[in-house]
A protein has these predicted regions:
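Active-site mouth loops of central-metabolism enzymes
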Residues: 13-25, 74-81, 123-128
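Beta/alpha (TIM)-barrel catalytic core signal, keyed to glycine-rich beta->alpha loops juxtaposed to Asp/Glu
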Residues: 76, 109-313
């Protein structure tokens, strides 16, 4: 399995299993099957509400812990410095682990403590209510305590990362962002290379199975794109495999989600597909700057956040 080297010298598997949208009752079986196939990288989050089942699967893993890479994420309601370590400890308890390999700030958005999804204006905290450097310092203390080896961010712009790094003692290892041929994120890819921050691509297949409330009318379907389908035929592969191969060819970590044993194997085998320059050129022409996961549900009339602030500041 291909790995990338982080600034710390640690090696992260380039391919992993996403667990967002994996339903209770399905995810334990899926993770066990993935580990059996040879997956070594699991991407989790407290808000996915399935870390307990992931932990049950991890408890049955017969291999050594150091062979696995496990990522989780700090939810928006636990950004106060005093809430960071308890949130991480809860995740470790659920995952049945003594430490994570990577812990990310899930979104640069603050909720009041204990809120899962805000239902009123008073459950949002404004961006400046909790300076990101304070949350980050609490994460650094978690590294020093041995609870996580690396820390990073998710859904952060370059400007927000720059603000964080002005006072950071530990630089972000990863920025996990939506990334696929319809949202190629070239500027962020270049920024990451310049700063030594690796990108992880979430929703690499277009997140067609996300909740209806997060979908827009007449949105494009990535897996049905003609160029992707033609490239798949050329390589005797599936469209999903081409999308995974494309992400790997650009030097990003990729974490497709599936609970289907057949697709778990197909996704794993995508690591063997090598796209040529012509393939990459054709796919590079597909960029629409289209976000399937745009955070609009955080930018309601009750919220102090806007899409412009989220993605452009």
């Amino acid at each position: 399995m291909e790995t990338y080297t982080l600034r710390s010298g640690a090696k992260i598997p380039a391919f992993g299993l996403g667990t967002w949208k994996s339903k209770k009752g399905e995810v334990e079986k899926a993770v066990k099957e993935a580990l059996k196939i040879g997956y070594k990288h699991l991407d989790c989050a407290a808000i996915y509400s399935n870390e307990t089942e992931v932990g049950q699967a991890l408890a049955s893993y017969a291999g050594p812990r150091h062979e696995l890479w496990v990522t989780s994420k700090l939810w928006n309601s636990a950004h106060q410095p005093e809430d960071v370590r308890p949130a991480l400890e809860r995740t470790l308890l659920d995952l049945r682990l003594t430490h994570l390999d990577l812990y990310l700030i899930h979104w640069p958005i603050h909720f009041t403590a204990g809120v899962v999804f805000p239902r009123s204006a008073d459950q949002f905290l404004p961006p400046d209510a909790i300076p990101v450097e304070e949350t980050w310092q609490a994460l650094e203390e978690c590294v020093q305590a041995g609870l996580t080896t690396h820390i990073g961010v998710s859904n952060f712009t370059a400007q927000k990362i720059d603000a964080l790094m002005r006072t950071a003692s530990i630089m972000p290892a990863i920025n996990q962002i939506e990334l696929h041929p319809y949202l190629q994120q070239d500027a962020m890819l270049n920024y990451g290379r310049e700063k030594g921050i690796l990108l992880t691509a979430y929703a690499p297949l277009g997140s067609g199975d996300r909740p209806k409330i997060m979908k827009k009318a007449e949105e494009p379907v990535l897996l049905q794109n003609k160029t992707i389908i033609e490239t798949a035929k050329k390589h005797k592969a599936t469209p999903g495999q081409v999308l995974i191969a494309w992400a790997l060819a650009r030097g990003t970590v990729v974490i497709p989600k599936s609970v289907n044993p057949k697709r778990l194997r197909e996704n794993f085998k995508a690591q063997q597909i090598k796209l040529d320059q012509e393939d990459m050129a054709h796919i590079s022409a597909l960029d629409l700057e289209w976000r399937f996961v745009d955070g609009e549900n955080f930018c309601t009339a009750d919220s102090t956040y806007t899409l412009d602030w989220l993605w452009n500041e």
